[in-house]
């Protein structure tokens, strides 16, 4: 999964990566050459007192060092550029895929997990690319090249390499093997703590209202402790790795000095050669350390790549047909034909063979008890959900055959829980239509009964709005959402219980003002208060997912027992008579 992801997303940066590999190879070759130069200066210059040779070779050695530094800096810069660009592309692709998800896919992953996958997980893969680009050539060439150079210059000491390298490889392998299963556990724990944190921030009012602060603190503490334990275990193993490497290195160097010193005394090895051998030994062990570091990063990045690929491989249940149309023969009409809807992995039908037609420019209200399917109808009309069977038609076109952008342009939806984005009043209203003028915004605010409080806010239309609209009241937030839908001037307006946060007088004024402002616009209203929809051209009554009544207020009082029961419970027996 990791290789497939990298192969796909690094292809545009092949040129950069080739340059990185060439520069890294040059840098390593220079690094391997430096100990030999140093040995020659000692053996042929210092030992013989030839200062001219020392100056000449010293200057050459300085030039090689400068070239090594330039290659290293350039390789690191290009590697970082390739890795950051790949990370940007990957985040964009994940975001584009998630943006097309329906409520079903988002619920399946969880919002917190999707955020983690597009931030932390991408960062881990990005870091692997950067480290691999700088170490992929360096580690093996340095280790193998160091062995060749060391054996060539001091064959009598090469047995020390044969002892130290296997010991180091076994030790590193044992530690890394213990770390692998911990990485997936850590990512799962990270998802869990992000989910808890997000729920607590989103539901802070509910938590306080039910005095659940202590319980939620304990819940977060448990999640925090879980991730801390896994992280602590990873840290313990990681911390153990480097002292172990240094121990092997130090013991080996002591051995080199001990046995090499005897060989120098016997005249078998020159002093410069012994120093070069120690330098090569350090390079060999550093190559192994870099390789071991990569073996630590690769499993964690592999887990992250798998989680990212899982998102990218998930196909949205709501997709656009290749032959999608953007024309609607009868603008403003809304129709359902024998629509049934069942949530995935559920047995009960939320809607069962529901059929109705809404004529252009008319007002249709939808009423029913809790869990009768009212909001599901709204989501199906806006194609936020896909019908299990039957047809949903907007403007005479099946929503499954319509281009999503063109479909959504036909309607303005005011959800049950309106959401405002961080910005200003104007920027939120212009989400519906960017080219709307200030006069049009004020006109929509006046109809939505929001002009008074917006004009009193500092800045008016430019007054700041916090994320989620948390700096305005629930009723104000709902009125701004209604104004936003009005600014759009769609063929169809859908209100999903959008007046519930308004008091009776404000509700009445808004409906009175909305009448002339929405002439010719089809309105579908999910309502709880029967008194507010008695003038509707058509009222649909849902009960347990079935359409049990359809008609005007007067007709339903005479023909629909469920509607009479609703009216009686809200307005009294006299109103239902």
Locate the predicted segments by residue.
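Transmembrane helices of ABC transporter permease
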Residues: 12, 16-29, 131-186, 258-269
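ABC-type nucleotide-binding domain
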Residues: 327-577
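Pre-NBD coupling/linker segments of ABC/ABC-like ATPases
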Residues: 316-329
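An intracellular "coupling" helix at the cytosolic face of ABC transporter transmembrane type-1 domains
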Residues: 12-15, 100-104, 120-129, 133, ...
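Helix-loop-helix
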Residues: 49-53, 149-166, 172, 176, ...
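Juxtamembrane helix-loop junctions of ABC transporter transmembrane domains
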Residues: 22-23, 27-43, 47, 55, ...
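Membrane-integrated ABC transporters
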Residues: 1-34, 46-61, 75-79, 83, ...
């Amino acid at each position: 999964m990791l290789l497939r992801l990298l192969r796909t997303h690094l292809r545009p940066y092949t040129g950069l990566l080739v340059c990185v590999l060439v520069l890294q190879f040059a840098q390593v070759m220079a690094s391997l050459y430096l100990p030999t130069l140093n040995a020659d200066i000692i053996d042929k210059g210092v030992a013989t007192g030839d200062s001219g040779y020392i100056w000449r070779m010293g200057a050459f050695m300085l030039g090689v060092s400068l070239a090594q530094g330039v290659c290293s800096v350039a390789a690191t810069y290009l590697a970082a550029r390739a890795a950051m660009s790949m990370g940007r592309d990957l985040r964009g692709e994940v975001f584009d895929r998630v943006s097309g998800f329906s409520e079903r896919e988002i619920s399946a992953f969880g919002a917190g997990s999707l955020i983690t996958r597009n931030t932390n997980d991408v960062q881990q893969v990005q870091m692997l690319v950067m480290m691999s680009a700088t170490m992929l050539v360096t580690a093996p060439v340095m280790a193998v090249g160091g062995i060749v150079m060391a054996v060539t210059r001091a064959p009598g000491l090469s047995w020390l390499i044969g002892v130290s390298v296997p010991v180091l490889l076994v030790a590193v392998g044992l530690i890394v093997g213990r770390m692998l299963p911990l990485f997936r556990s850590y990512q799962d724990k990270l998802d869990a703590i992000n989910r808890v944190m997000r729920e607590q921030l989103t539901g802070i009012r509910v938590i306080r209202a039910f005095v659940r602060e202590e319980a939620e603190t304990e819940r977060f503490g448990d999640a925090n402790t879980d991730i801390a334990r896994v992280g602590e275990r990873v840290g313990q193993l990681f911390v153990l790795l480097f002292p172990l490497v240094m121990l092997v290195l130090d013991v080996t160097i002591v051995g080199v000095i001990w046995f090499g010193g005897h060989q120098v005394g016997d005249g078998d090895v020159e002093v410069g050669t012994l120093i070069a051998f120690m330098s090569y030994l350090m390079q060999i062990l550093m190559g192994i350390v870099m390789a071991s570091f990569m073996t630590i990063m690769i499993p964690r990045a592999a887990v992250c790549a798998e989680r990212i690929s899982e998102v990218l491989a998930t196909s949205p249940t709501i997709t656009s047909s290749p032959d999608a149309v953007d024309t609607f023969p009868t603008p403003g009409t809304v129709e359902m034909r024998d629509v049934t809807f069942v949530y995935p992995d559920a047995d009960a039908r939320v809607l069962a063979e529901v059929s109705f037609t809404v004529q252009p420019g008319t007002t249709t209200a939808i009423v029913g008890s809790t869990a009768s399917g009212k909001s599901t109808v709204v989501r199906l009309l806006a194609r936020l959900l896909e019908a299990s069977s039957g047809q949903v038609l907007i403007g005479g076109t099946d929503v499954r055959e319509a281009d999503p952008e063109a479909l959504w342009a036909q309607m303005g939806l005011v959800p049950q829980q309106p959401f405002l984005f961080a910005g200003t009043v104007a920027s939120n209203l212009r989400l519906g239509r960017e080219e709307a003028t200030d006069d049009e915004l004020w006109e929509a605010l006046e109809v939505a009964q929001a002009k008074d409080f917006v004009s009193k806010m500092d800045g008016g239309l430019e007054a700041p709005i916090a994320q989620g609209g948390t700096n305005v009241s629930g009723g104000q937030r709902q009125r701004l959402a209604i104004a936003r839908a009005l600014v759009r001037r769609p063929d169809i307006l859908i209100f999903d219980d959008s007046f519930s946060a308004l008091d009776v007088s404000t509700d009445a004024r808004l409906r009175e003002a909305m009448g002339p402002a929405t002439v010719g616009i089809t309105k579908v209203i999910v309502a709880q208060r029967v008194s507010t929809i008695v003038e509707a051209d058509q009222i649909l009554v849902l009960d347990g997912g079935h359409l049990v009544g359809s008609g005007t207020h007067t007709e339903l009082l005479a023909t629909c027992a469920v509607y009479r029961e609703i009216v009686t419970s809200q307005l009294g027996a006299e109103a239902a008579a």
